[in-house]
Design a protein with these regions (language model features):
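Signal-transmission/dimerization alpha-helices at domain junctions
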Residues: 1, 37, 101-107, 137, ...
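Signal-transmission linkers at sensory-effector interfaces
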Residues: 1-29, 36
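Short, hydrophobic-rich beta-strand element in sensory/regulatory alpha-beta domains
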Residues: 25, 32-66, 72
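Regulatory sensory and allosteric helical modules in signal-transduction proteins
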Residues: 65-119
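Flexible loop/coil segments at beta-strand boundaries within sensory signal-transduction domains
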Residues: 68-69, 135-140, 149, 160
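Short beta-strand-to-loop transition segments that serve as allosteric relay/switch motifs
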Residues: 79-80, 127, 143-153
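A short, aliphatic-rich beta-strand micro-motif
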Residues: 127-135
């Protein structure tokens, strides 16, 4: 459910988008906002949500779909290692591939429960992830991905808000 904090943040982001000319800068603002406001900040404190040598951090970014190449390219990311800027993922890889194929949102509150989960982040395996497809004029153009290392960071209510941010 959208709370007043999220509504105010969306208002600010939309106002910012109307004044900024660089699309990637606008999308980076969305990535940063989602990392700051979505997810359970106490998830990392629950026993079992972090494994040995893991620490809580989050990432977000947009994978823009390139249908001619059957892949998606990472842009406007927050928290990803610098060497993964413009990372390209084939359409058939992991859960981003599932979203590309089905064009539906996907929530993995605990990635350990999915034996087919593929590690995309070069530096760590994430424990909780949200994927929201993006459309323009009814056409699939990519997806917004947000992930955290602690399992159970993201719940249904976070994913619903994530989808609202994505549709802006």
């Amino acid at each position: 459910k959208l709370g007043s904090l999220h509504l105010e943040q969306l208002r600010q982001l939309i106002t910012y988008a109307q004044t900024e000319n660089d699309v990637e800068t606008i999308l980076k603002a969305f990535s940063a906002a989602v990392i700051k406001t979505l997810g359970d900040p106490s998830a990392a404190k629950t026993p079992g949500n972090l494994k040995k040598n893991e620490h809580q951090f989050s990432v977000a970014g947009f994978f823009l779909h390139i249908p001619q190449r059957k892949e998606s390219c990472l842009v406007a990311e927050q928290g990803f290692p610098a060497e993964q800027h413009r990372l390209r993922i084939p359409d058939d890889v992991g859960h981003p591939g599932w979203v590309t194929k089905h064009k539906k949102p996907l929530l993995l509150s605990n990635t350990d429960e999915y034996s087919d989960f593929k590690q995309i982040l070069k530096s760590a395996r994430m424990g909780s992830a949200m994927y929201s497809p993006m459309f323009s004029n009814g056409n699939f153009i990519g997806q917004f991905i947000t992930a955290s290392q602690a399992r159970q960071t993201y719940r249904i209510q976070d994913h619903e808000i994530h989808q609202v941010y994505t549709s802006c």
